[in-house]
Regions:
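Small-residue-enriched hydrophobic alpha-helices in membranes
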Residues: 1-129
Length: 129
């Protein structure tokens, strides 16, 4: 099921970092969640090194939504997993602000992921906290 190449994982991780930073609070918990995402797709790689690369990509990019093209090309199962990781990062600080909600709406629209399913993932994660 979990099949993404290294470059895709770096790009999607950069999007996760961007999502974590959008509320201007990039915590260690959020970094750990991004590392968990990396480990779930690249088991034999050094997740700290990949995270550092993703942070550099995020810092040097002015249009991170380009990485949604990488997501869009994948199966619905992988899209769902990525959306779940994005929501985990967002709710890790126990608040969802308007910028985070707007970002998720935009990402879901760009990758053709159903709003209803996105909302179900969000509710499932909120209820499991």
């Amino acid at each position: 099921m979990k099949k993404l190449d290294r470059e895709s994982v770096i790009g999607i991780s950069a999007l996760l970092v961007h999502t974590a930073k959008i509320d201007e609070n990039y915590s260690e918990d959020e970094k750990n969640l991004v590392r968990n995402f990396i480990k779930s797709y690249l088991e034999s790689e050094d997740e700290k090194k990949i995270l550092k690369e993703a942070e550099e990509v995020e810092n040097n990019s002015n249009q991170l939504l380009n990485y949604t093209n990488t997501i869009k090309k994948n199966s619905m199962v992988i899209k769902k997993d990525i959306i779940e990781h994005l929501w985990k990062v967002i709710i890790s600080d126990n608040t969802i602000d308007q910028y985070e909600s707007n970002l998720m709406r935009r990402i879901c629209g760009l990758i053709y992921f159903p709003d209803k399913e996105c909302a179900e993932i969000k509710l499932k994660l909120l209820n499991s906290k």
